[in-house]
A protein has these predicted regions:
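Short, acidic Ser/Thr/Gly-rich low-complexity loop/linker segments typical of extracellular
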Residues: 46-62
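A short, solvent-exposed loop/turn motif at the edges and junctions
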Residues: 47-50, 72, 76-88
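Membrane-proximal, glycine/serine-rich, low-complexity loop/turn segments characteristic
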Residues: 60-62, 76, 83, 90, ...
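Outer-membrane beta-barrel translocator domains and adjoining extracellular loop/strand segments
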Residues: 211-212, 277-282, 357-373, 382, ...
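Outer membrane beta-barrel strand-and-loop segments of large Gram-negative receptors
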Residues: 378, 512-514, 558-565, 665, ...
Length: 961
């Protein structure tokens, strides 16, 4: 069947109509005859019997429409800063070359008139667009500072961006990658003064952009559209500061823009938890905690403060990091257009961090209906981490209907860590059950390699296309863990002490290959059919060898078979499906079904040989509806089902004895999960009043949800020949359970307050999570409810007066079926004000004051504290390019970091060591040189629509949506 389908598709390619008429031309500036790139060209049939052809001029000003039927047409050209151009043309039975078309600047541009009628936000199809000019900021503000003022967009203290209730995973600049997928690096290193627009949208996968069909691989994304007159020039800043307690911070960023060619450099070194980038954790070792006391999920609140200065070192962010870090980082980003057909971008990034932390944990473990156990832990840790990552993307447009896209990512990580832990297990926080003291020294390294090769072809017939993608993913992790532990167990009449001294050698590998063949065919004037075939092949291995210390030989040479395991796993899928779509640019619905056959094979080759082979047949559905309710509002509804296999570490049946009060193991009998997701989005934008409303609903269920089964020993039990589960100790393993539900809502309303020249954003939400679990073979359901409300008032006065007031409150209600009378309600609230006042002579004064309050946590964790950061400085040198700033962090010496984590088996409160008061003197020098830009702002913003409305697939092969 598949061979027939492939033969049919390539047969259609060969015998496609090759005699279609084309219309081409070259746009140029009427005054200096330079190419006009990024302009929007529309070709409309005079009798309106066809949907219009739309494309965008390339960097050489040229454009082409293919397969244009004979008839009379109107050619329209629009571009920001230029007068509209319209010309009537007649298409006969041959190709038409319109030659050079001169476009004159608009009268407003020639007279240098500033137009102030722009609106804060507007909806453009599936894209929400904010006008940067409508948000007044200080001259040294970054892209992150800008988006914080926009309704529906939030940035937490660690730099994570949320838009319309979803985490932003990618930020591009003029449609081009900037440091790969590192949204933090883009927003914190790009000055706000070069930004013209911020576009928020759901980015389809590269393959789905050809067809417009959502394949489930969408990511919430932001595209930054730069100002046309700032696309040729150099800009950036360098800074260096030194303070009390030997605190230091130095670094900078510089960008060289020459239209399509762009080179950016960033560098950073400090010991004040400043991180202007995101760090990838391939090894799973740099996140907080998880030393064996059980995995931790969720958590919120707390923080190390957030202080935004006015100079080059203005990213004073500590955020949710655990501990105090010394950081060194360097990165380079390159993007360019190699001729007319090749767009390329690439980046290299290195970072090294040395993090020290002192952590306290207070945990309540649910045991039975009437009893709980309590675990208290103190730990000291040091973590040295090294990351190298390379990203590369090449888009080769063979012609207007064919392209090849190559995307590559390579990441390396090396991590060395030391953890010293002291833990006590008790009954009712009085009667001691056991205690442990252990240290773990770990040396881990790994790499990941991801590569995608995608061929896309748009046929002359609009709506007919074919694409073939090939993906490879390689992941490798190796590590050595040295454990020294002493455990004490309190029995009724005796005290038992044991010691452990061992080395664990771990190796994990995963290789995955996948293909994706997609064919689309128009059905009538408004409908389209998609057929896809997607096989994938994944092979994983996990080897763990544990050696006890041999005192006689003075080395780790005694193999412990109870703690050693060699495990292989394969997961292969065959997926084929069909989707039907009907609609136009305003309204569209689609529905599809696919059949997936999956095989999950697990082979244990040591210490015993076992084989498990599972196969699954699933029907997966998808549906989408986009409705334009009015000129100001629209509604989108998305449904998709999917299946996901368990990881090889979840499957491997080997005991982890790092914390011998809490053992964990894998489960080779795990099944794949089946997930249903529904997303509803309502958007209302009133451009005339600059008002906006966003309301989102998310709902998901999971069958065979991978949860945890936790067993607390009521008496000593043997897990193996060398592992004893003592009374009061726990063993946890993953199991499949039904009943998982997650639901959440997000609402925000933005409006201007003209009488104080400010913007007010209200937000509210409700979330619910149902987590099933097993406690001593008894079902326990954790029901978590969260209610949140917040408001942000941000100034929009001038660059000399910038302030933001914010407030947020969270009420959390957690109930467990095993202990329904247990009160786990807690409340957190945060209020803050930031001010930045600047005089025309360069004197500035800044404040960042916040209050954090926690109620309902365990004793010692209920806190109410203030974090006050302040700075005063003077700008000097020509054009105020230099700056000297004196700042203080945590003026009141009250900074803290507190989180609460809730799972199906326990609730815990965590306190981490944080950065506290220091003073710093910082010098900053600003770089800024701009030439004449030649790229239209309005045109380049359409770059991200490649495969939708713009080049190269905006021609005959595209379905007009």
């Amino acid at each position: 069947m598949y061979k027939i389908l492939i033969s049919f598709l390539f047969g259609v390619m060969i015998f496609a109509n090759v005699n279609a008429q084309s219309v081409s031309g070259i746009l140029q500036d009427a005054s200096d005859k330079t190419p006009l790139s990024g302009a929007t060209i529309k070709l409309s049939k005079s009798d309106a019997t066809l949907n219009p052809f739309i494309t965008v001029s390339n960097s050489h000003g040229s454009f082409t429409f293919r397969n244009v039927p004979e008839g009379n047409y109107a050619l329209t050209v629009t571009s920001v800063g230029y007068a509209s151009f319209k010309k009537d043309i007649q298409i006969t039975g041959k190709n038409s070359n319109l030659g050079d078309i001169s476009i004159s600047k608009s009268a407003e541009t020639l007279a240098t008139v500033t137009i102030n009628s722009a609106t804060n936000v507007r909806q453009k199809n599936d894209t929400l667009e904010y006008a940067a000019s409508q948000y007044k900021l200080n001259p040294d503000a970054t892209g992150e500072d800008l988006i914080k003022k926009m309704p529906g967009v939030t940035v937490d203290k660690s730099g994570a961006v949320t838009a319309q209730g979803e985490t932003v995973q990618k930020v591009t600049v003029d449609g081009r990658d900037f440091f790969g997928d590192d949204a933090t690096a883009t927003l914190r290193n790009l000055p706000s003064e070069v930004i013209d627009k911020i576009q928020v949208f759901d980015k389809l996968s590269d393959q789905a952009q050809l067809t417009g069909f959502d394949d489930g691989n969408t990511t919430k994304s932001i595209n930054i559209v730069t100002k046309a007159d700032m696309r040729t020039g150099n800009f950036g800043r360098v800074f260096a500061g030194y303070g009390t307690d030997d605190r230091y911070s130095a670094g900078g960023n510089v960008s060289f823009f020459n239209n399509a060619r762009r080179i950016s450099l960033i560098g950073l070194t400090n010991n004040v938890n400043q991180q202007n980038f995101s760090s990838q954790d391939l090894l799973g070792v740099t996140s907080s905690g998880n030393r064996g006391g059980g995995g931790r999920r969720g958590g919120g609140g707390g923080g190390g403060g957030n202080f935004r200065g006015g100079g080059g070192g203005n990213n004073f962010s500590v955020g949710q990091q655990s501990g105090i870090a010394k950081t060194n980082a360097f990165g380079i980003n390159y993007s360019d257009a190699w001729g007319k057909k090749i767009d390329v971008s690439g980046s290299y990034f290195f970072n090294n961090s040395n993090t020290s932390n002192d952590q306290t944990i207070n945990r309540q473990n649910f045991i039975t209906k009437d009893s709980s156990q309590y675990y208290d832990e103190n730990s000291i840790s040091n973590n040295q981490n090294y990351n190298n990552r390379v990203n590369f993307r090449l888009d080769y447009k063979i012609d207007s209907n064919n392209s090849i896209l190559i995307t590559t990512g390579l990441n390396f990580q090396n991590n060395n860590s030391t953890n010293l832990v002291s833990g006590v297990n008790s009954l009712n926080q009085q009667n001691l059950l056991s205690q442990t003291e252990y240290d773990i020294n770990s040396n881990n390294k790994g790499y990941s390699f991801n590569n995608e090769i995608l061929f896309r072809h748009a046929f002359p017939k609009r709506g007919r296309s074919v694409s073939l993608g090939f993906n490879t993913n390689f992941n490798n992790r190796n590590g050595e863990n040295f454990l020294n532990a002493q455990n004490i167990y309190y029995k009724s009449a005796t005290v038992i002490t044991d010691t452990t001294q061992q080395l664990s050698d771990q190796k994990n590998n995963t290789n995955r290959y996948s293909f994706n063949l997609v064919y689309t065919e128009p059905v009538g004037k408004r409908a389209q059919l998609q057929i896809n075939y997607n096989p994938s092949f994944q092979k994983s291995s996990a080897d763990q060898e544990t050696f006890n210390y041999d005192n006689t030989a003075s080395k780790y040479s005694l193999l412990d078979t109870s703690l050693s395991n060699k495990f292989d796993n394969t997961y292969n899928t065959q997926n084929t499906g069909i989707t039907y779509r009907l609609g136009d640019r305003n309204n569209m619905i689609s529905a599809g079904l696919s059949y997936q056959y999956s095989e999950l094979k697990s082979d244990q080759v040591f210490p015993q040989v076992t084989y498990i082979n599972n196969s699954y047949s699933n029907i997966l559905a998808n549906a989408f509806a986009r409705l334009k309710l009015s000129s100001k509002s629209n509604l989108r509804v998305i449904y998709r089902s999917s299946v996901n296999p368990p990881s090889v570490t979840q499957l491997q049946n080997v005991i982890n004895n790092s914390n011998q009060l809490f053992y964990t193991t894998g489960n080779p009998d795990l099944q794949q999960q089946y997930t249903n997701n529904i997303i509803t989005r309502y958007t209302y934008t009133n451009s005339a009043k600059s008002q906006s409303i966003f309301a989102n609903l998310y709902f998901s269920t999971i069958n065979n949800y991978v949860s945890n089964a936790t067993y607390t020993a009521s008496k000593d039990s043997a897990l193996s020949s060398s592992v004893i589960l003592h009374k009061g100790s726990q063993l946890s393993k993953p199991v499949n359970l039904n009943g998982y539900i997650s639901a959440r809502s997000f609402f925000t309303f933005g409006m201007p307050l003209k009488f104080i020249k400010s913007n007010l954003n209200w937000n509210a939400g409700v979330s619910y999570a149902k987590l099933p679990g097993l406690l001593n073979n008894i079902s326990n359901i954790s029901n978590s409810y969260n209610y949140n409300l917040g408001a942000v008032l941000s100034s929009n006065i001038s660059e000399y007066v910038d302030f933001t007031l914010s407030y947020s409150a969270n009420i959390n209600d957690v109930k467990n079926t095993i202990q329904p009378l247990l009160n786990n309600n807690y409340f957190t609230q945060s209020a803050g004000i930031t001010t930045n006042f600047l005089t025309k002579k360069g004197l500035f004064f800044q404040n960042d004051i916040s209050n954090q309050s926690y109620k309902g946590l365990t004793d010692g964790f209920n806190q109410d504290y203030w974090l006050w950061n302040m700075a005063i400085g003077q700008k000097f040198l020509k054009n105020q390019m230099g700056e000297l700033k004196l700042s203080v962090f945590d003026l009141l010496k009250q900074n803290k970091s507190i989180t609460r984590d809730v799972t199906e088996s326990y609730v815990q409160d965590v306190r981490n060591h944080v950065l506290q008061q220091y003073f710093m003197l910082t010098f900053t020098y600003k770089l800024k040189t701009f030439g004449k830009g030649r790229v239209s702002s309005e045109g380049r913003e359409n770059r991200r629509f490649e495969g939708r409305d713009g080049q190269p697939f905006g021609g005959p092969g595209r379905f007009p949506l």
